[in-house]
Amino acid sequence: MEEYKDTLNLNTTTFSMKGNLSVNEPKTYAKWQEQQVFKRMQNRKDNHGDFTLHDGPPYANGHLHLGHALNKILKDIVVKREYFKGNKIYYTPGWDCHGLPIEQQILERLEKEKTSLENPTLFREKCRDHAKKFLEIQKNEFLQLGVLGDFEDPYKTMDFKFEASIYRALVEVAKKGLLKERHKPIYWSYACESALAEAEVEYKMKKSPSIFVAFGLKKESLEKLKVKKASLVIWTTTPWTLYANVAIALKKDAIYALTQKGYLVAKALHEKLAALGVVDSEIAHEFNANDLEYLKASNPLNQRDSLITLGEHVGLEDGTGAVHTAPGHGEEDYYLGLRYNLEVLMSVDEKGCYDEGIIHNQLLDESYLGEHVFKAQKRIIEQLGDSLLLEQEIEHSYPYCWRTHKPVIYRATTQWFILMDEPFIQNDGSQKTLREVALDAIEKVEFVPSSGKNRLKTMIENRPDWCLSRQRKWGVPLAFFIDKRTNKPCFESEVLEHVAHLFEKKGCDVWWESSVKDLLPPSYQEDATHYEKVMHILDVWFDSGSTFKAVLEDYHGEKGQSPSDVILEGSDQHRGWFQSSLLIGCVLNNQAPFKKVITHGFIVDEKGEKMSKSKGNVVSLDNLLKKHGSDVVRLWVAFNDYQNDLRVSQTFFIQTEQHYKKFRNTLKFLLANFSDMDLKNLERSHNFSPLDHFILEALETISVGVNSAFEEHDFVKGLNVLMAFVTNELSGIYLDACKDSLYCDSKNNEKRQAIQMVLLATASKLCYFLAPILTHTIEEVLEHSQVLCAFLQAKDVFDLKDISVSEKLHLKEFKKPENFEAVLALRSAFNEELDRLKKEGVIKNSLECAIEVKEKALRENLVEELLMVSFVGIAKEKLSETPAFTLFKAPFYKCPRCWRFKSELENTPCKRCEEVLKER
């Protein structure tokens, strides 16, 4: 039989079964960079639409991790998908370069070197160098993921032109009357020694003291109530703020019970408090909260007066119904203070320690000076003496600094804010608040998943004013001058534009380097002594939030359209970049700077737990790339429901590798079996068999399904449809049935050539669908197939377009074989019987079989092809009690060439093979 092997069409391909991705991919990616492939993609002549994905900037600090890979790969898949659809694509990657993490890195380095650097310009220079270094590192790491974009000219928030653009966005906010300097409580990170915006705060569980404290009513107040003894009971988990208490808030119209022992609490909570042992159970008197307003109690910590007020924020679900109020340490307290003209006491310094204000205002004794507020709590509780009614420890959700992971405090300081509820003039002349404009804008944005809409909406509805100022050095300054004569900022256009021009020319380091006089325009320089610089820097969320202006609008469409078609980030950006971009877009243009928001989950381990070095469950991106290659990592991203958290472990990547091998091996089989095609046959029409029509119809059906899923960015759904087709219809049915013709028919046999055209069409569709995900692999496929390139009129992966299979194959319609489902049912029953006979040792394979079927409507040729048997007969009689088919050994000899049992003489070829051999 060996002598016939060379007469078979056992075609091969140079496309390897093993991808050896970690070795070959870097070469491909380097070639793409050298060939400036992204520019070529943008300049493709037949682009028929525009698509802009605006990149949310990663932070230029540290190496990439798997979360970065997830984000950038998803963006790359979305962008490439639009490109292969025929759109002109715009994608400019960018980096967030300013901010605290880089400052901390430099400070730690200086501490190790035992040097200090007071000069802000030199300090900023070190920060800039650090950002440059990691920007290049991350850029190269992104390229190793097969990500394409305008990496030749990425955006960097520290570029001079960019800093000027950020500043001009800030100027627009100021000109519209939405920028105000205020003294009010804000989140304060004592670890960073800086104010924080809401987006920079994360909540964690924290153990805190929970205390109930009695504030005795003053003599005049007791007389008004006509009682001899009464103490309002407050509950707090921040004993350190008691020094700054100036009021107690009650719930309007609520009834308050005075117990026999003289404790005053909300009646609705009395029974609960009595059970805890905070107060006694017998009620002596009841009062309406409205009758208690403006009475005074005494702070047991320092004997200062505490005014009784009514507050809308007071609830009756827990606590005592009497809320400790310190306007210097709480936002609700602050706003209540504005209503009642309360004093704002705040004697805590930048490091979170009590300052000299506690002595000047007689708030605490001198021993507390310089002590950290959290450390001081134990002594404060002891100092309360008999006024402390109950002390417990509770675990509750508490705000933490997201950079240092240390708890934050509320601290009243003078900061700059963007006002959420100040009306400003819209483009149409009407007036709305920023909150109203943002909420209207959200309604016009598409969210994937749709739940993101309500999430962002709720955050905008409830968010406070945006605290913009930071007490740091590495950032864009709030470059305004305060006129010392009026104590107001100078918002004159001439001054502001002059500063913006300086930033564009020299960078914003000039704000630290130059004097006030040198920073002012010539017409203002005579009055330079009347002005002083604001030395705060901007919240970095303002930097990144204004990137749509700097990248899309300032370049007038060269780098994409604004609003962008899509932004795509992790779900945590609802409180970060999505919000900051939305708010700045609504100030500048009265609309969202994006049309669609896509969000993805986080990377977790196989148990669903967050990855951390301390847990030892971090999966290294670098190790994954070395072991599996970037195309496998990309396939893992696409084969997951990215809208939820993605579980990762070596097990999951091994599964993904199996998926990859299935696609690769299928493509290898297809390439090998049309490799001997004459290119002249590509354009002519062919006579396709019923089986060909079956697979072509299936290909058309799944193409609709995959396109629909991909259009909705549901890549896992699309890939599952594609994988099911490859596994079931293609490999499981069609390819097996075609092998005899492919291997054993003559090279120019019409049936074989028709099959090859089907294989070409199938390979084309697989390449088109997989190209956005497995770009390197599809590039490799095309490199190894002149026939496929000719069929697609493509020299490489970037020439790929979707094809119409029916047009390419000159078919008006796909004619699925009649009774095909019946044949498949017969095949299933046959395979069961075949397995039984194999186990019993009766036969070795299906070719030894002949089959007689009782269904006359079934095509004999189709049954023979699908069941891969050597003979099919139709039963003369159709009796209901007989089985659907009868199986018996083929009545002829085995052909030594094709192995079918169709030879009339032993060890001689069958008729078909004889004819093929004659042609040779």
UniProtKB/Swiss-Prot annotation:
Cofactor: Zn(2+)
Positions annotated to bind Zn(2+): C895, C898, C910, C913
Entry EC number(s): 6.1.1.5
Catalytic activity: tRNA(Ile) + L-isoleucine + ATP = L-isoleucyl-tRNA(Ile) + AMP + diphosphate
Molecular function via GO: aminoacyl-tRNA deacylase activity; ATP binding; isoleucine-tRNA ligase activity; tRNA binding; zinc ion binding
Extent of motif 'KMSKS' region: 610-614
InterPro entries in alphabetical order: aa-tRNA-synth_I_CS, aa-tRNA-synth_Ia, Anticodon_Ile_BEm, Ile-tRNA-ligase, Ile-tRNA-ligase_type1, Ile-tRNA_ligase, M/V/L/I-tRNA-synth_anticd-bd, Rossmann-like_a/b/a_fold
Residues given in the record as ATP binding sites: K613
Cofactor remark: Binds 1 zinc ion per subunit.
Pfam family, one: Anticodon_1
Broad enzyme group: ligase
Superkingdom of source: Bacteria
Binding sites annotated in the UniProt record for L-isoleucyl-5'-AMP: E569
Residues spanning the membrane: none
Positions of short motif 'HIGH' region: 58-68
Record remark on domains: IleRS has two distinct active sites: one for aminoacylation and one for editing. The misactivated valine is translocated from the active site to the editing site, which sterically excludes the correctly activated isoleucine. The single editing site contains two valyl binding pockets, one specific for each substrate (Val-AMP or Val-tRNA(Ile)).
Family named by the database record: Belongs to the class-I aminoacyl-tRNA synthetase family. IleS type 1 subfamily.
Function: Catalyzes the attachment of isoleucine to tRNA(Ile). As IleRS can inadvertently accommodate and process structurally similar amino acids such as valine, to avoid such errors it has two additional distinct tRNA(Ile)-dependent editing activities. One activity is designated as 'pretransfer' editing and involves the hydrolysis of activated Val-AMP. The other activity is designated 'posttransfer' editing and involves deacylation of mischarged Val-tRNA(Ile).
Descriptive protein name: Isoleucine--tRNA ligase
Species annotation: Helicobacter pylori (strain HPAG1)
